[in-house]
Amino acid sequence: MRAPVLAVLAVLLLGTVRAAMDECYEEGSPQRCMPEFVNAAFNATVVATNTCGTPPEEYCVQTGVTGVTKSCHICDSGQFHLQHGAEYLTDYNNQAEITWWQSQTMLAGIQYPSTINLTLHLGKAFDITYVRLKFHTSRPESFALYKRTHEDGPWIPYQYYSGSCEKTYQKFNRGFIRTGEDEQQALCTDEFSDISPLTGGNVAFSTLEGRPSAYNFDNSPVLQEWVTATDIRVTLNRLNTFGDEVFSDPKVLKSYYYAISDFAVGGRCKCNGHASECVRNEFEKIVCNCKHNTFGSDCEKCLPFYNDRPWRRSTADSPNECLPCNCNGRSQECYFDPELYRSTGHGGHCTGCADNTDGPNCERCRENYYRQDNNEPCHACQCNPVGSLSTQCDNYGRCSCKPGVMGEKCDRCQPGFHSLTEAGCRPCACNPAGSTDECNVETGRCSCKDNVEGFNCERCKPGFFHLDEANPRGCTPCFCYGHSSVCSSAEGYRVSSIVSTFESGVEGWTAQQRDGSEYSLSWVSDSSAVSVISESYFPIYFIAPAKFLGNQGASYGQNLTFSFRVERRDTRLSAEDLVLEGAGLRVSVPLIAQGNSYPSETTQRYIFRMHEATDYPWRPSVSPFEFQKMLQNLTAIKIRGSYSERSAGFLEEVSLVTAVAGAGPSAPWVEICSCPTGYIGQFCERCAPGYRRENPSQGPYSPCVLCTCNGHSDTCDPESGVCDCQHNTAGPHCERCSEGYYGDSTTGSASDCQPCPCPGGSSCAVVPRTKEVVCTNCPLGTTGKRCELCDDGYFGDPLGENGAPRPCRICECSNNIDPNAVGNCDRLTGECLKCIYNTGGFYCDRCRDGFYGNPLAQNPDLKCRACSCNPYGTVKGQSGCNQVTGQCECLPHVTERDCSACEPGFYNLLSGRGCERCDCHSLGSTSGQCDVRTGQCECHPGISGQQCQQCEPNHFGFGPEGCKPCDCDPEGSGSLQCKEDGRCECKSGFVGTRCDQCEENYFYNRSGPGCQECPACYRLVKDKVNEQRGKLQELEDLLKNLSTGEENITDQAFEERLREAEKAVNDLLLDAQSSKDVDQGMLDRLAEINTTLSFQLERLQNIRDMIRDTDKQAQEARDRVENTEFIIDSARVQLEKAKMAIANVSITPPESTGDPNNMTLLAEEARKLAERHMQEARDIEKAAKEANDTANEALRLLQKTLASENQTALDIEELNRKYAQAKDIARELEKQASKVHAEAEEAGNRALQIYANLTSVPSIDTTALQNEADKIQKEAEELDSLIDRKLRDYEDLREDMRGREMEVKNLLDKGKTEQQTADQLLARADAAKAQAEEAAKKGRETLQEANDILNKLRDFDKRVNDNKTAAEAALRKIPMIAQTIAEANNKTRQAESALGNANADARGAKSKAEEAEALANTVQKKAATARAEADNTFKEVTDLDGELQDMLQQLQEAENQLKKKQAEAESDEKMAEMASNATKDAESNANNSKKSVNGVLATIDELLSRLGQLDSVDVGQLTVLEKTLDDAKNQLRDSDLDRKLAELQESSNLQRVALDSYSRDIDQILRDIANLEDIKNTLPAGCYNTPIIEKP
C-alpha cells in the first residue's frame, strides 16, 4: 500500500524541483533562494536504544478516562503484524492503519532513571522549524529533545518537557526567553506532560517560538546556528502513570511503556540562501545544488575562481553571491586574500598568471621579464646569470652588469678582465668543517677529512651527511638500518639533553659489581650526588636508569658528560671505566681517554663522545654501523664508581646530548634517508607497500622483498607477508579461490576465480570428468545440484514453480515436533503436520482442546497438559479449560484450577449445582468453616445446631466462648433449663440463681418437702425489715441525690432534709426501744436470733471474702474491658489504615463513578460499630464501678448494723439480699463483658473480613508494612555499613593522598630545580645574545669605517667617476647582495630537486591511475590514494612555483644591486678588505637560512667565508669563485622550470580526469550494491499471513 503513495510523492517532489530550478535568479539577477519545506524525518533512519519484541513480550493498553480498563497484546519483533520497530516512527502516517514504535514495558525496568534514546540521522544540516511527536500511548512525564549541528558533534539540549522541570532537569518551568538572555538555551515546560489523552497526544516544538530575535532571524547568527541540526535525538526519561505502579502488579506494569506513532521534523535543507534544492551527490550524500557561484554541502564556500569578496549567507536584502576574481584575462585561478580585501575592497588574488605576468591581478611582469606596453606579453630578460648583477632588466631588455663585464646581456668580459665568474678570483675557499689544511697553492684544491669531498671540501661523500667541524671524520655515515647510503639532515629536530642532577634522590640510578650483582647505592643530599664504597679492589659501577637507555640513536656523535670525584686519590684505572652495552655489543673506554683527567678529591667534569673513531678509543673497535646499531638499542651505561679499596666514589650531574622533535636549536646530526625501492620511513625502517620482511625476526634490519601474491595483489602485510588478496582469491599468497568462487588462482589473471552459480554465494566444486559445477555447501534448508530444492524441515519455492519464487525457510513448529522425524511440515506451505506434546495449530503453537499450558515453553513438562476438570464443580457442557492458565469454568462458589474444591465457607460440591454457603454463626462457631460434605459447623462448647446458632439443652449465655451449663438445683428448680441470664425457675419458697436457697421467712426442712414458711410471728419481723429497707432506700436515694447533685439544693432544703433524716433516726431509735418492751417469748426469740446472729457473723466473714472475690472479679472485668478497648482500638487503627488505603486508591467501579464503593461503606460501618461497642464497654465499666460502690456501701452498712447491736436479723437478710444483688450484678457485668468482648471480636472479624475484601486493591497490611519497615531497617543497616566502609576508604584515600601530596611536593621541588636549570639556560642564551649583538655592533662599526675609506677611493676612469655615488651606495649593500646570491642559488637547487621529485611523483601517480583503471571493481581505495597523491603533488607544484617566484624576485634585486657596483671592479686593498668584512655578515645570515640542497649553498657559504679571511684580493681566486657562481646560475637557467611546470600541470590534469572517471564508476557500483541491498531488505522476513492464535 505504501509503494503507490511513495510513487505519488516522488512525482510531486520532481515537479517541485523542476519548478524551483530558477528560484535563485530573477531575470538573470541573483536572489535569495531556499529548498522547499519538507518533513526531513520522512523515511529517515531512527536508532532506538530500546524496542519491544525481543524476546516476545506482553503489553496492556489502557482505555477509559482513567485507564482502568486494560486489554493485553503481544509485541514480537519476529512477526510482522506484532512488531513495533523504530522504522515505524518515520514511515507514512496512515491514520487508517497506524504503525508505531514501542519500548519494553515498566515490567522490564523501563522507568526513570533509565532512559531511552531515539536518534534521527538527517544525513545533512537542516534549518529546523519544528519537531513533532505523536504518541500512541500517553505522553511521558519527562522527556527531552537534543540536536547536533554537525556529524560526530556534541549533543546540544533543544527542549525539555516535564511535569517536574526543576527536579528532573534542574530547569525552571517557563516557555519563553527574555530579551538579553542566551537565546541558544533550552527551555523546560510542563505543557505536554499530562497523562491524558491516553493515546494520540501530540507534542510540537517550534525552534523559534519564545525567542526575541526570531523576528530578525536574518541578522541573528545565534538563531541561525540554533535552528541548524544534522541529527535529532529524543530522550525519554520518565513515564506518566496513575500511581498504581507502586504496588508492582505485573498487569499494571505491563500497561506502562513508551509508544510513538509519528516522528516529524519540519524544515528546509540548509543551503544558506544559495540553493533552491538539495540533491544526492556521487556518494549518495545529500548536498545543496548550489547557485550564486558557491559550493559545499551547505553552499558554505565560494567556487575557486569566485573569491573577490568573502562568502556570506544570502539574505532577503542581499543575495551575497560570490564574485569572480579580476585577473585581466590572464588566469582562471585565485584565492581570497583578506589583507588585499581590507586595503582595496577586492580580495581576489590571482595565481598561475599567463604571459609571464604576476601580481594580485596579473597586472605586472614576473621577475626577470619585461614589456614595453601593458597589453603585450612579457618577454624574458635573458641576462647572463654569471656576468649580471641581477637577472632583471629594464623596460627595454637591458641588463645591469657586474664590474668588468659588458654587453647588453652582460655575457662577456671587459678588456683587462678574465675568467668570468660570480665574484672573480677569490681566496682559497676551503670549508673548515670539511678540510684539514689549506688548499694547494697551485691548484686551489683543499685537503679534506675522511668522509668529505669537493674542491673546497664543501660536501660529504656519498653515504655520509652533516658536515660538522667538530667531527674528526667531517661527516656522519648514513645509518638507515643498512638499507640506504643516501641521507641528509632531517628538519624539525632540536637539541635536547637527558639529565640526572640527583637533587631529590638517586633518580633511578643503581649500582652493580662487575659480575652484575646488585650493590648498595647512597644518595648524598648535601652535594646532590650518589656514591658507592667498594669493600675490595673489584670495581663498582653506577648503572644508568631507563631514560638513558633504549633508542639513543640521536646521541650518535654527541657527548656523554658527568661530574665525578673520589674520596681518596688512590686510583687504579682500567680499560673498562665507562661501558656501553646494546644490540649484542659491548664497548668500553678508560676514564682518562678523550682528554679527560685522572679522578681526584675535587669534582671534575668528564666528557665522552659517542663515536667509534680511533680518536675516541672505544674497545673493541667497531664499525660506524655497529656503533649506531648499539645506540639504537642501548641496554646499559656503566660508569665506574670505585677505584680503590674502601674509597668512595661520588657521581654528580650526568647529561647525554640527544635530539627530539620540536622547535628550538636545530640538531642537524639526525638523518633522513632517501630509501631505495621497497623501503619507506625516515630511516628506511619500514617496508613499502608491496614488500615484506625477508626475515621478520631481524626487525627493521631485515631486507624487504616483493610480496608473493600470484598476481592478485600489489600489497601484503609487511611483517607476515600475507597478501591483501583481490580478484576473489584467498590464502597467504592468494593461492586459492575465495569461498563462493572456483577456478585456478595461480594463473595470475583477474578472471582466475569465477563466482559459484549457487544461491547466497555458497561454495562449489568442478567435477573433473564432466566439468560440471556442483554446489557443495547449499544454504541451510536447500538441496540439489544448484540448491534448487527445499530440504526436509524447510518450506518454500526457490525456483517459483508454484508462483513467485520464495526462499526456503525453516518450518516454524514452535519446537513441538520430533526433530528426528521426517515430514514434520509441508515443504510448500510450511504447515506443521506432526505436532507433539499435545499441541496443534498451523505452527504447533497452541494446545489441543482439553489441554492447557505454554506450548512455546522449552521444557516439555511445562507444555500442554490435560485440563482434568472436576465434573461436579465444572459448568455442564464445558470439557475444556483456559489454554494458558488451565482454569476450568467453575460453578458458583467452586474454586481451584480444576474446580475440585469449595470456596472457604461453602460446602456440598457433589450437588452438581455449585457449593452452598455454610452460614455458620459468627459467635457460635469456632470458625467460618464447615464440613465440606454435611455442612456442619464447628461449634464452641455448649453450642449446638448445624450453624452453631443455639445453646445445648440446660445451657445458657450464648457467646464467643460457648454456652455455660445452667446447673439448676433439681430440688428447688421447676426445670433444669434456665433463662438466658442463667437464672433458674424456682419452686415456691426457693430463691437464688440456681434455686438452691430458701426465700426470706422460709427455712429448709431436711425432713420435709424443701423450704417451708416460718411461723406467722416472723411476718412481723419481715414487715419491719421491709419498712427499714424502705427507709434505707430513701436514705440511699438522698445520698445518691447529694452525690450526683442532680437537684439544686439550697441550704434551707438541705437542713429540712437533715431534720427529716434526724426524725427518721429518732423514730428508728424509738422503735428499737419499744422492742425492749416485748414479752419474754420475744426475748427468748431474740436469744435464738442472737444465736442465729453468731451464725450470720460467720457468714458475714464469708460475705467479706466473697466481696473481695467480687472486687477481684470486678477488676478482672475492668481488665477485660480495657482489653476489649485495646482490641477495639486496634480494630479502629486497622480500619483507619484500610480506609486510608481505600481513599488513596480511589477505585471507581465500572457501573458507578459517583458513589463511594462498598468497601468504604463497610469500613465506615465497622468503624461506627466499633465505636458503639467501645461506648458500651465504657458504660459497662461504669456499671461495674457502681456495683463495686454498692458492695462497699453494703459492707459499711453491715458493719454499722453490727456495731449498734440493735440491728435485727432482717438487716442481715437485707445485706444478704444486697450481696446477692451485687453478685448478680457482677455476674451480669461478666456476662456483658463477655458479650462486649464477643461483639468486639465480631467487629474485629468483620474488619478483617472487610480488609480481606480489599484484595482487588493493593495489599496494605501491617505485616507488609512491618516487612517493609524491616527491609528499610536492613537497608539502613547496610547503608550504615556502607558509610563505615566509605569512611574507611576515605581514611585510606586520605593516607594515599598524603603520599601523593609528598610526591607532588617532590615533583614541585624538582620542577623548581628544573626551572632554575631553565633560568640558567636562559641566562646563557641571554649572554650569547649579548655577544651576538656586540659582534653585530662591531660589524656595523667596521662597515662604517669601510664606508669612510670608500669615500676616499680614487676614480679609475670617466665611467667610474660618473657612477661613484651609485657604487658607494651599492657597496653598503654588499652583505645583502651576497646573501641574496646564496639564497638564490640555494632555492634554485631546491626548485630543481623538488621539481624533479614532483615530476617523478606525477609519473608514479599516473602509472598507478592507469593500473587502477584495469581494476575498476575494487578501485575505490586506490583511487582515493591516487587522488590524495595528486592533490599533494599539485600542492607541491603550487608551493614550488611560489618559492621559484620569490627566488627570481630575490635574484632580480641582487642583479639590480650588483649593477650599481660595475664601476668599482678595480678597488684597492682597503676596498677589498671592507668588502671582505661585509661578506662575513652575509655568510652568517646565509648559514641561518633553510637549506634543502647542501651542495650549492655550502659552496657559496664557504666561498664567502674564505673571502672574509683574506687580507687582500687575489684575482685568481676570484676567478674560481666566479666560475662556481656561474655554474649555479647555469643550473638555474637550464632547469627549464616553465616547461616542467607545464608538464606537471598537464599530468595532474590527466590524472584528475582519470580519477573523476574512476569515481563515477565507483559511484555506479556503490549504487548498484545499494539497490541490491534495498531489494534484499524489501524481501519478507517471515510469513505475513500468520493467523492470530489468541485474540487480545
UniProtKB/Swiss-Prot annotation:
PROSITE patterns in UniProt: EGF_1 (PS00022), EGF_2 (PS01186), EGF_LAM_1 (PS01248), EGF_LAM_2 (PS50027), LAMININ_IVA (PS51115), LAMININ_NTER (PS51117)
Stretches the record annotates as Domain II and I: 1013-1592
Domain Laminin EGF-like: 269-324, 325-380, 381-427, 428-477, 707-755, 756-810, 811-866, 867-917, 918-965, 966-1013
Cysteine disulfide partners in this protein: C269-C278, C271-C288, C290-C299, C302-C322, C325-C334, C327-C350, C353-C362, C365-C378, C381-C393, C383-C399, C401-C410, C413-C425, C428-C439, C430-C446, C448-C457, C460-C475, C707-C716, C709-C723, C725-C734, C737-C753, C756-C764, C758-C775, C778-C787, C790-C808, C811-C825, C813-C832, C835-C844, C847-C864, C867-C881, C869-C888, C890-C899, C902-C915, C918-C930, C920-C937, C939-C948, C951-C963, C966-C978, C968-C984, C986-C995, C998-C1011
Keyword Glycoprotein: yes
Compositionally biased spans, kind Polar residues: 1476-1489
Domain of life: Eukaryota
Quaternary structure annotation from Swiss-Prot or TrEMBL: Laminin is a complex glycoprotein, consisting of three different polypeptide chains (alpha, beta, gamma), which are bound to each other by disulfide bonds into a cross-shaped molecule comprising one long and three short arms with globules at each end.
Functional note: Binding to cells via a high affinity receptor, laminin is thought to mediate the attachment, migration and organization of cells into tissues during embryonic development by interacting with other extracellular matrix components.
Protein name stated in the entry: Laminin subunit gamma-1
Annotated source species: Xenopus tropicalis (Western clawed frog)
